[in-house]
Amino acid sequence: MKKILIMLLAGIMMLTSGCLAVGSADNGGNKKVANRIAVIQTNKGTIEIELFEDKTPITTKNFIDLAQKGFYDGIIFHRVIDGFMIQGGDPTGLGTGGPGYTIEDEFRDDLTFDGEGILAMANTGMPHTGGSQFFITLAKTPWLNNHHTIFGKVVKGMDVVRDIGHTQVGFQDRPVHDVVMEKVTIKEAE
């Protein structure tokens, strides 16, 4: 009887440890994928932005696809408001253009305009009207929460963003001297 009890307990322990091992392997297989980095080379310096592929996949895929096609290369930051944001991504340079399509909004409670360096999709003020235009904040802007999809954050070159923010502007907040995105590339996370 004692042998049967010991064998039964040993069997239960083996089954339990086997189940735990499977659970651990499963949990270990769900590793967080590192987000890629957008590198925006401007005539004022370079900005690096972590793209939130894990949280806003539609918007980041759209941005990455456009960047990899060279869509942003040579486009200006057409709207600059010191203390608020810098905006670019319009192929016409007038603030009215885009890629010829729009994408869905991806608002998240865990992504907020809580400081400078937030990358978000510009829109017309109506739902699901983002396309290629984006902006980077120069300050905390909580009134924009749930109105613009946040899809990244500056990780290097915030001094360049601030410098662009101090650019002299004219009519419709357009820089007097063009601030050009010379090249926009995507690199793997470090």
Predicted regions and their residues:
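Cyclophilin-like peptidyl-prolyl cis-trans isomerases
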Residues: I4-E190
